[in-house]
Amino acid sequence: MWRLRTGPKAGEDTHLFTTNNYAGRQIWEFDANAGSPQEIAEVEDARHKFSDNTSRFKTTADLLWRMQFLREKKFEQKIPRVIIEDARKIKYEDAKTALKRGLLYFTALQADDGHWPAENSGPNFYTPPFLICLYITGHLEKIFTPEHVKELLRHIYNMQNEDGGWGLHVESHSVMFCTVINYVCLRIVGEEVGHDDQRNGCAKAHKWIMDHGGATYTPLIGKALLSVLGVYDWSGCNPIPPEFWLLPSSFPVNGGTLWIYLRDTFMGLSYLYGKKFVAPPTPLILQLREELYPEPYAKINWTQTRNRCGKEDLYYPRSFLQDLFWKSVHMFSESILDRWPLNKLIRQRALQSTMALIHYHDESTRYITGGCLPKAFHMLACWIEDPKSDYFKKHLARVREYIWIGEDGLKIQSFGSQLWDTALSLHALLDGIDDHDVDDEIKTTLVKGYDYLKKSQITENPRGDHFKMFRHKTKGGWTFSDQDQGWPVSDCTAESLECCLFFESMPSELIGKKMDVEKLYDAVDYLLYLQSDNGGIAAWQPVEGKAWLEWLSPVEFLEDTIVEYEYVECTGSAIAALTQFNKQFPGYKNVEVKRFITKAAKYIEDMQTVDGSWYGNWGVCFIYGTFFAVRGLVAAGKTYSNCEAIRKAVRFLLDTQNPEGGWGESFLSCPSKKYTPLKGNSTNVVQTAQALMVLIMGDQMERDPLPVHRAAQVLINSQLDNGDFPQQEIMGTFMRTVMLHFPTYRNTFSLWALTHYTHALRRLLP
């Protein structure tokens, strides 16, 4: 039976090193002797129910670890469920009861080190690079036991679409990129193609690939991955020259101007490209060469395949001039830089510089790196440099942290959302303190959560000349996951800072030792550092590159991947945190903080769309963006009566509320950049919760409370017997087209909304 281990309990390794005793670390382990027959039956039932329901939802409820934690803590929901028959007759006690039972359930899910574990996956291109890398290096069977493979197959087949392909993410239509690399995964772990039998998933995938022209229609990243494996030719790839990292900072585009995730990914890819590394052929590789293409492998004209991309994959098409540009770069890098004597004078120097960057970034993130995609490429690059090196062994030691097990099977996830989920969870608890007694259970949860925040803040900048190595200031920030990962994010920092400020205002006898005030100042300095001239705030680093550089993007299935941008959600979170900070510490950088808030509020107002919403860059989509935008504006002192932007936002939500009283927005809003309701105008509890909070912040209760009551009725009636909320559609996103799964959102946002609602009802009490 699978068990989730967290923190120091997740196990030690001689090649691991940590900054805070592994706070937030998550590892899945299989114990053949664990679990009673009843527990095993419950897990199997969850698996069957998920597989039977994939035609409706492909997002897991993340039940396996939840079932484990609830058993270990002997959780029992003793508060009866509340059902609201008439939205106009909701009582304060009803809302408070629903909130209380939801909090009791959710507090039982907290890990010993204070964080809330959760899956953070969704893209179907996360797992294959890991498997291909481990296969090439000969470590696949050392990491993936038969039990791992069993769960891996379960997940791959659960995510397969009816037509035989795999989408870019779990709810997407089939695309060549993910279909090819998941097919390769199936073959690597021993699945046979068989015949074109509709019951044979591998055969269905093969047929989809052939019906859509073959693997030459894979986007660039897929082509590079196949080239490394030896089932595609590097000459069929657009260039990823390592010489790029030698460009001076005075050049319009250089390593420092790139979006941080693209930089980390292409750092490893450029090393592989510069080396033209190809795995030694195996019988399987030779078979794949013939299976992936409609024509014989030896007869493929690779030059003609370089700019191919399947229409199903293509989101960011290139113009003729862009194709001409990349052709020129290819001619220069291959005809000149890759030949004697420049291959010795420049190419070798570029490869050495690239590897130095890889090592620096790996060390700075304790070998977690910036995500599962760069992790696989960096790990392979280190193995190519020296298969016996400590660099490679340190990479292997961190692989298990990317593996996640759910009722849908095994998948590779992002580096984790531990900090982000914990900060949002604490908001729901802290905002509701006045509306529920701080009993021992809640108190313990708060103390542990605060302890996790204190342990997770980054306390120093990257070592050495970090600007030269394309790293920015990190001191004072919080990451998306844990301190070891080392990449601070603006909204994670803002939400964590605001929580710490709330804790700062509470008595020490309730929450224990408080955070050093200087560390609060460090967090403020980090947020101030990230603000752009337009008032917005970026996610990871100050905006440096120009938007026109997107013209150079080599990535066909994403948008806005070249440079960093400002984001409405990050800006709204920063305003909320800095406003609270200024109230509690008006003596620290008062002028700078107030200037930040004024400029940031103006930026948010400027970014509002015509219909009154805001585009959400990190969540689905206009409802998500509107929640964080309005929250920021209200924190800045804006109200429905004095701010047209808030009035327009309220009108947008009232116009999109469905007949049931809730809201439901499709992920299709993200790529189309147009509000798209869910099929059948159905409801999603996460978006209903976000919309409900916006209406309350927009003073809707004072004008016409019925829309708010109807939304609250949806949330309260959706609550399950144990206090959980139903898992529905995918809610996270990045770069327009890729969706991320945040299963904890159904709890955090629903509870947060019920907290707002109970506050609003209490104000109406006589």
Curated annotation (Swiss-Prot):
Catalytic activity: (S)-2,3-epoxysqualene = thalianol
Gene disruption: observed consequences: Loss of thalianol production in roots.
Any single GO CC term annotated in Swiss-Prot or TrEMBL for this entry: lipid droplet
Superkingdom to which the source organism belongs: Eukaryota
Listed InterPro entries: SQ_cyclase_C, SQ_cyclase_N, Squalene_cyclase, Terpene_synthase_CS, Terpenoid_cyclase/PrenylTrfase
Spans of repeat PFTB: 149-190, 520-561, 646-687
UniProt keyword terms in alphabetical order: Isomerase, Repeat
Tissue: Expressed primarily in the root epidermis.
Induction entry: Induced by gravity and light. Transcriptional expression is repressed by CLB.
CDD domains linked to this entry: SQCY_1 (cd02892)
GO biological process per UniProt: response to gravity; response to light stimulus; root development; thalianol metabolic process; tricyclic triterpenoid biosynthetic process
Function noted in UniProt: Converts oxidosqualene to thalianol.
Family designation: Belongs to the terpene cyclase/mutase family.
Misc. remarks from the entry: Constitutes with three contiguous genes an operon-like gene cluster that is involved in the thalianol pathway.
Protein name as annotated: Thalianol synthase 1
Organism name: Arabidopsis thaliana
